[in-house]
Every structure is written in structure tokens, then in C-alpha cells.
Regions:
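Extracellular "leader-to-stem" segments immediately downstream of a signal peptide or signal-anchor
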Residues: 2-230, 237, 246, 258-262, ...
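Short edge beta-strand segments in beta-sheet-rich domains
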Residues: 15, 272-274, 437
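Residue-level marker of regulatory loop/turn positions in helix-turn-helix DNA-binding domains and
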Residues: 82, 218-220, 228, 251, ...
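Short, T/G/N/S-enriched strand-turn elements that build extracellular solenoid repeat scaffolds
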Residues: 91-97, 114-124, 139, 176-179, ...
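Short glycine/acidic-rich loop motifs that flank beta-strands on beta-rich extracellular proteins
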Residues: 102, 116-117, 138-141, 193-196, ...
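Short strand-loop junctions, especially beta-strand C-caps/beta-turns
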Residues: 109, 302-304, 328-330, 364-366, ...
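Right-handed parallel beta-helix
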Residues: 132-133, 173-188, 232-242, 255-268, ...
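Extracellular beta-rich repeat passengers
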Residues: 351-509
Length: 509
């Protein structure tokens, strides 16, 4: 039984002025002081990527593939598990439909509603379509996912995590993974079975247990659900992604990514490194109307040297028990023009599990993997039960490298409310140095616990109508004047499939 998220935030009047760090919410004035080296800086705001007026559409069908299996518990007889019977016939349909602009449609027939497959490759100008009522299950045979060449062994712990193909590999541009919606709201489902025991793995344990074991050293070689590299205009729409062994979605080094109206349903505890939606080295990204619970980041933007991530919008996305909406830790290629608005974060998943790294909005990096992160705007953000509502650090690891220094500039938080904060709770504001401070504006930010980390340092902050003021070594605070906007009045929706128009975001009142 999933826990209902019916919590509500009470509307409060606008509080004038700002509050001392760690103090109870009571009006106080901010005495403007000049920023080092000149007058107070002005922070521009991100525009992100433009949202389409209408959601993506379900494509026409090129070929239909009918289910031949059924299961009540997500498992199949031994011979079926050892040699998944649907890989070849689904891939044959995908190969035949490549370039058509149409879909290979997986459909239930009578009592048969399941497919069992190893890695699939979606070519250019085609889509994999999973009908509501049908479930595509991932093989648990590690050998099915093994990549060729001098790489790690899939299903093993190794020094690298490069041994496994994903279940679904985006192998061409203008492609996607799409589901249909049943009258009761249920979506077509792709189930990674991360909880199931691996066949032909290093140990007699599940994918998730292998990930937990890798904490003590090495990296887990588990398959992702959806992965793409160097492909443009990828659409992931109206599909339920469940229990991934590793990342749910990683799309990298392309232009044009839309993730719209999906549900990611994986527990917050015991499912290590099961990130939700990860765009890496991507340009023109839209992530909208999604419901996400998993064992790592809800959304995480990253970049490698020479390949920036830029022009992205995250809108009407709701996160449960995750590690937050994050940027980093790799930021070496730079990240810019990222807009996050009308989002909510609950520190607990629908099963009642508390996040294992309970963050709200987070920018993290470290020397050796850092770059310039600038023009990032958060608007109308709601949180409940979040341990670290605001988390900004260029020292995410203990690296002492003098190359690829993290720099965070033009970070704006305009409209944020956090309630139900656990104990202890703290926020972190940290820049790299006095010459490379964190530049941040906080407007209309109200937390029910304003405690800050003792690591706070090197910050230039502008503040208006907020009850948290960064404080610490080499921290300068100036008044932002009267910034247009307001503290959000919030209702966090219960976790479940997003409705056709997207889940209700925090209302702008």
C-alpha cells in the first residue's frame, strides 16, 4: 500500500524583510552593503527551453507485437528467464520500422500481458510504444547486457561501470519511448526488476544488492532502463518506468530531449544509483509533468569538458524520496540557462521511506570536475520533509585538484516554501573562494527551519522577503530591493501516474 501524500501547506501572509540565519521567522531588516569590488551585482534570470503548447503525440503504428507471457509476481519459469523469448522478435520489428517515423507497438492479448527482453536498440525515426495493460520486463541475465571489448563484466563490481548495455538503447535521432494511457490512468510499463536476483552475476543477489555492495569499493555494473548517446530529438512520453537496476534515463551529447508525463516508480531505500532523469552534455531539454520517486536524484544535469549542458526547463515535476533536483557533480563543460519552476519535493516516497540523501534544490561539484554553472533560476518550489532544502557546494568531494574549478554564478531562487522539515535540518551556501564566490539571490523564500551549515563561506547574496540569510566566512549580503513575486501557496499531489494534463503544480497565488 502506497502512502498517500495529501499534505498541504497553509497559506501565510507575505513577510516583509529577511531573517537572521537560524532564527525563528520574525521580520528583520537587511542593511545593504556593497559587494566586494563595486556596487551590488544584478542577477539575470534563466529563460530555459520553451515548452511546447501541446504534449507529444502517440505515433502511428508500423508493426504490432503481441504479448505471449503473463506473470503475477514479475518472475517467469527458469527456462524463460535464462533465454528471454521476446528480444529477437521486438528487435526485428524495430529494425523493420527504422526510418518510418512510426512505432513498434507492444500490446497485451487476452491473459498475456508481459514481454521479457534483453537489450533493444531503437533506431532513427522510430518509436517503441508500450500499450497500457502491457509490461516490458527486463532480463535478469547479466550476460544478455554484456558490451563487447575491453570493458567491465556486466553483473560484477569493477573499477569501471561500463560493462552493460541498457534495456532500451536510443540508437538514432528523432526517436523515443512512449506509452498509452488506460481509462483508469495507468500507463504502459517498463519494469527493470532491480529487486530480482541476477542470473550469471558475480554474486547470487539482486541488481540493487550489487549496488549496495559496491559502496565498500568499486562500481556496480548494472543496466540502465533507457540510455542514449549522440542522438537528437528524443522523446520519452506517458510511460511508467519501474524498479530500474541503475539509472532510469540517461541521455547525453545531443540536442533536443523531451521527457513529458512519465512516472518513475522505484523505492527511495535499497535502490542505489537509480537516478530518475539525467541529461548530460545536452542542449534544449524539456522535462515536464512528471512524477518521480527513486533511490537517487530526481533530475540531475551534468556536463563533461568541452560539452556544455544548456537551455533546459524543468516544470511541474514532483519528486518523492529522491536526492533532489540537482546540477552536478560533473560540471566541467559548464551548465547555463536552466529554469526550474512549479516543482515539489517530498522527503518521503509513497512507501513511507525517507530519502537516503534528503535534498531539495542542489548544485554540487568539486575541483577536477568543475566548471562554470550560471544562469540557473528556481521559481515556485514547494518542499515538505526535506533535510537540506538549499544545498550549494563546490567541495562535494575532498579533491585537491587545481584544474576544472567549480564556479556558481547568477543563481536565483524566487519563491520557495519548506515545511515539515525533519530534525536536524540545514541549508548550505558555499562558494569556491573569495575571488570565485557563490552568487545567489533569494527572494520570497520561507523555510520552517533556517539552520545553516557551519561550512558556509564565500558568498555574495541578495535577499528580499525571505527568512534565511546566508552567513559565514566571507559572506556578503545586500538587499535585493522589492523583487516581484511571492512565496508559493503549496499543495503537493499524491504520487501516482500523472494525469493527461500533467499533475497540478503549486498554484501561483
Amino acid at each position: 500500500m502506497k502512502r498517500a501524500h495529501s499534505c498541504c501547506f497553509l497559506s501565510v501572509g507575505v513577510l516583509v524583510g529577511s531573517f537572521l540565519a537560524g532564527a525563528s521567522p520574525a521580520a528583520a531588516d537587511v542593511t545593504p552593503s556593497p559587494a566586494p569590488g563595486g556596487p551590488p551585482f544584478g542577477l539575470p534570470t534563466a529563460t530555459g527551453a520553451p515548452l511546447p503548447v501541446t504534449p507529444p503525440s502517440v505515433p502511428a503504428v508500423c508493426q504490432q507485437v503481441q504479448a505471449r507471457l503473463s506473470t503475477s509476481n514479475g518472475l517467469f519459469p527458469g527456462p524463460v528467464e535464462a533465454a528471454p523469448p521476446d528480444t529477437t522478435r521486438i528487435q526485428a520489428a524495430l529494425d523493420a520500422c527504422a526510418g518510418s517515423g512510426k512505432a513498434v507497438d507492444l500490446v497485451a492479448t487476452g491473459a498475456s500481458n508481459a514481454f521479457l527482453s534483453g537489450p533493444l536498440f531503437v533506431k532513427g525515426d522510430e518509436y517503441l510504444l508500450v500499450d497500457a495493460g502491457a509490461t516490458l520486463y527486463a532480463s535478469r541475465n547479466a550476460g544478455d547486457y554484456q558490451k563487447p571489448g575491453d570493458v567491465a563484466k556486466c553483473g560484477y563490481i569493477a573499477s569501471q561501470d561500463n560493462g552493460c548495455y541498457a534495456l532500451i538503447n536510443m540508437d538514432g535521432s528523432n526517436s523515443g519511448v512512449i506509452g498509452t494511457r488506460a481509462p483508469n490512468g495507468n500507463l504502459g510499463t517498463i519494469d527493470g526488476r532491480g529487486w530480482a536476483t541476477i542470473i550469471n552475476g558475480e554474486y547470487d543477489e539482486s541488481w540493487w544488492a550489487l549496488g549496495e555492495q559496491a559502496k565498500s569499493g568499486g562500481k556496480q555494473n548494472n543496466p540502465m532502463l533507457i540510455n542514449g548517446y549522440g542522438v537528437n530529438d528524443v522523446t520519452i512520453y506517458q510511460v511508467d518506468l519501474t524498479d530500474s537496476p541503475f539509472f532510469h534515463i540517461l541521455i547525453q551529447n545531443g540536442t533536443g530531449l523531451t521527457v513529458w508525463g512519465i512516472e518513475i516508480d522505484t523505492p527511495a531505500v535499497g535502490a542505489r544509483n537509480t537516478d530518475g532523469i539525467d541529461p548530460k552534455n545536452e542542449t534544449d531539454v524539456v522535462i515536464a509533468h512528471d512524477m518521480v520517486q527513486d533511490g537517487d536524484d530526481c533530475v540531475a544535469f551534468t556536463s563533461d569538458p568541452g560539452t556544455p549542458t544548456e537551455n533546459a526547463t524543468v516544470e511541474d515535476v514532483h519528486c518523492y524520496g529522491t536526492h533532489g533536483i540537482s546540477i552536478g557533480s560533473p560540471t566541467a563543460g559548464g551548465l547555463s540557462n536552466i529554469l526550474v519552476r512549479d516543482v515539489s519535493l517530498d522527503g518521503y516516497d509513497s512507501f513511507g521511506n525517507q530519502s537516503t540523501d534528503d535534498n531539495g534544490i542542489r548544485i554540487k561539484s568539486e575541483p577536477g570536475h568543475g566548471g562554470v554553472v550560471h544562469l540557473v533560476t528556481y521559481e515556485q518550489v514547494c518542499m515538505t520533509g526535506v533535510e537540506h532544502p538549499l544545498f550549494f557546494t563546490p567541495h562535494y568531494s575532498s579533491s585537491t585538484s587545481t584544474q576544472y574549478i567549480p564556479i556558481f554564478q547568477d543563481i536565483v531562487v524566487d519563491g520557495l516554501r519548506a515545511t515539515g522539515s525533519p530534525s536536524p535540518t540545514s541549508s548550505l551556501f558555499e562558494g569556491y573562494s573569495a575571488s570565485e564566490p557563490l552568487q545567489i539571490e533569494l527572494a520570497h523564500v520561507i523555510l520552517d527551519n533556517t539552520t545553516q551549515s557551519s561550512q558556509n563561506a564565500y558568498v555574495q547574496a541578495r535577499v528580499d522577503d525571505s527568512n534565511i540569510i546566508p552567513a559565514g566566512m566571507d559572506v556578503t549580503v545586500t538587499s535585493a530591493g522589492e523583487v516581484p513575486g511571492h512565496v508559493p501557496h503549496c499543495v503537493i499531489p499524491p504520487f501516482g501516474p500523472p494525469p493527461p494534463s500533467g499533475p497540478p503544480g503549486p498554484p501561483a497565488q
